[in-house]
From Swiss-Prot:
Disulfide bonds join C26-C115, C28-C44, C43-C95, C49-C122, C50-C88, C57-C81, C75-C86. Its EC number is 3.1.1.4. Its cofactor is Ca(2+). It catalyses: a 1,2-diacyl-sn-glycero-3-phosphocholine + H2O = a 1-acyl-sn-glycero-3-phosphocholine + a fatty acid + H(+). PLA2 catalyzes the calcium-dependent hydrolysis of the 2-acyl groups in 3-sn-phosphoglycerides. It is an enzyme of class 3 (hydrolase). This is Acidic phospholipase A2 A'. PANTHER family: PHOSPHOLIPASE A2 FAMILY MEMBER, PHOSPHOLIPASE A2, MEMBRANE ASSOCIATED. It is found in: Secreted. It comes from Gloydius halys (Chinese water mocassin). Keywords: Calcium, Disulfide bond, Hydrolase, Lipid degradation, Lipid metabolism, Metal-binding, Secreted.
Length: 122
């Protein structure tokens, strides 16, 4: 679920998902179009693509199971669809963490009119 995604971003990247990524670049937040503006925006693009491949459940609403083992998030549970959602969220949170150094405030509330380039395929 999106609430769990927010929690994983805090656990893994150490920052607020809503504050930092709720409206960033062309892909972080609702919707997405054009080309990702930087590495953090690309994390959101890849996350959107990941959600797009999930079938049989609702990535934004369905609650999944995970545990923390030696500081790492381990996705679990019996439902392969929900496990896939968890993996999408975990990978995006790791991507955010790994790209904190290049995060740029100029992409906060980035105008959609600047996201008109042709999108690349997932």
């Amino acid at each position: 679920s999106l609430m769990q995604f927010k929690t994983l971003i805090m656990k893994i990247a150490g920052r607020s998902g809503i504050w930092y990524y709720g409206s960033y670049g062309c892909y972080c937040g609702g919707g997405g179009q054009g080309r990702p503006q930087d590495a953090s925006d690309r994390c959101c693009f890849v996350h959107d693509c990941c959600y797009g491949k999930v079938t049989g459940c609702n990535p934004k609403m369905d609650v999944y199971t995970y545990t923390e083992e030696n500081g790492a998030i381990v996705c679990g549970g019996d439902d392969p669809c929900k496990k896939q959602i968890c993996e999408c969220d975990k990978d995006a949170a790791i991507c955010f963490r790994d790209n904190i150094d290049t995060y740029d405030n100029k992409y906060w509330f980035f105008p959609a009119k600047n996201c008109q380039e042709e999108s690349e395929p997932c």
